[in-house]
């Protein structure tokens, strides 16, 4: 298998024995490995993991989908049961240090938290997966199935240089894999009770580019209409006419599970969400209090990018907008696009599909889902595990599309609101909770992959 020449400082930080590795220290180092996407440079992360595998004598393979866009994977051979993959992405979104209390690309410990870009999404879980993989390697004689570790590029921009590329160009890495753990769900503490969500499906991203054309001219002589005004009118109509609300089965199950720990009117509302969404003012109130819960009730579109003239005194002949739409996974993209066109086409808008994926759902009858339930209940007796629909998308859509039962789960327990730094400022993780999650992920892997 292919080996890499890695930077010396990676080798210096790694001890010979996996027993001597500290997950918090490893995560601190990993945060300092620059994989901000764009441009990605995920080969830096490949070198990071390769240095660990080299020192521990673990064979691995690597591949670049483009210069600097590295992917790495390793397999531990086990018994004859279908293989299980631990999948992570190594890229992170940009961070502006001016808005942080710490350097986002330096793992900083402060008041019991580790701060840094990616500690939640998803270098923290990635390192936890590494430690679960190393535990399996140390106990490989007990394995009832192969365990595959895979760290890929580009998830934050769609995964086309990462997991998607791997499936097309290195399908052998997925040989025999029928179970997969990825990002997507985690635990939240509500007083003395805990709810752990496991992502089983996700809203389908439909990214669109809108184009409006009109007569150019001088800014001093406004025309009755222009490319920009047409685009503004179309976007205003889109914004003011949200898609009809509906509750699909996985979302209904999730809301009912949340209702168990609620009281009074809120409990009644969440127990019967198909009826509740019809109440006047409810959806507006839900969006204000919890945008993520509201996003589970309907298809959504966020206007994220605008492009017009390059000069303030020039009326441009063409204007553009890009829109991030997320579709509930109960219908096809074509049907959604028809609904979208009804809202903008009368304004002379051309629509270009940038990206869209197909919907897929993983079964809660899976042995991996049951292992998550068992270990979580064992470690947190007052907890409940609920299947969830993610409003965002992960690389799991690639693997679900080829029949791999894929679940998004991080066993870390957090207080409500602790995840606010994801893709934002001051992303942080509680160190005590993080250490516990590393051990719990080992237990989940042992439950599903070790001979009893």
Set out the residue ranges of the language-model regions.
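Sec-dependent N-terminal signal peptides
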Residues: 4-13
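Short amphipathic alpha-helices in soluble, non-transmembrane regions
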Residues: 225, 336-344
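A short core secondary-structure module
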Residues: 164-166, 220-244
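Second-shell loop/turn segments in exported
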Residues: 32-40, 114-119, 196, 217-221, ...
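Acidic/histidine-rich, surface-exposed loop or edge segments in extracytoplasmic proteins
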Residues: 25-35, 211-214, 347-355
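An extended, acidic, His-containing surface patch that forms the Zn2+-binding/catalytic region
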Residues: 78, 189-190, 247-310, 317, ...
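Acidic/histidine-rich catalytic neighborhood of metal-dependent amide-processing enzymes
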Residues: 114, 120-197
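Acidic/His- and Gly-rich active-site-bordering loop/insert found
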Residues: 19-117, 123, 130, 136-145
